[in-house]
Amino acid sequence: MKNKLLKSKDFLQVFDLISSKGFKSNGKYQFQGIDAWHDFDGYTCWLSYKDLTITLLFHGKLGVEYENVDTFDEFYKKINGLIALS
C-alpha cells in the first residue's frame, strides 16, 4: 500500500465508500471503525474515528480535529487502505 497525501476529494471518496458499504445506525454510517454522516442538505459531511473528526465543507474546505497524534496516524493508514480498495 502506498501512502499518499490526502485531499478533500479523497475524504469524499471515503465518505461515499462508507455510506455505500457500511451499515446505518442512529443516523450515521459505520464501516471498519469509521463513522460517516452529513447534515440535512448534504453540504457538510463528517468522518470520525476515535477522538478524530474530519469536517468536509462545501467548496472543498476541510477541518481536522483530534486529541492524539496516534489516532491521526491510525486513521491516515485506514483511509489510505480504503482508497486503495476502491
Spans of model-derived segments:
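Intrinsically disordered, low-complexity regulatory segments enriched in Ser/Thr/Pro
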Residues: 49-74
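Residue-level signal for functionally critical sites in structured catalytic/ligand-binding pockets
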Residues: 10, 24, 44, 48-50, ...
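Mixed-charge, Lys/Arg-enriched low-complexity segments
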Residues: 70-86
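Negatively charged, low-complexity tracts enriched in Asp/Glu with abundant Ser/Thr
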Residues: 1-38
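Short, structured protein-protein interaction patches enriched in aromatics and acidic/basic residues
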Residues: 34-48
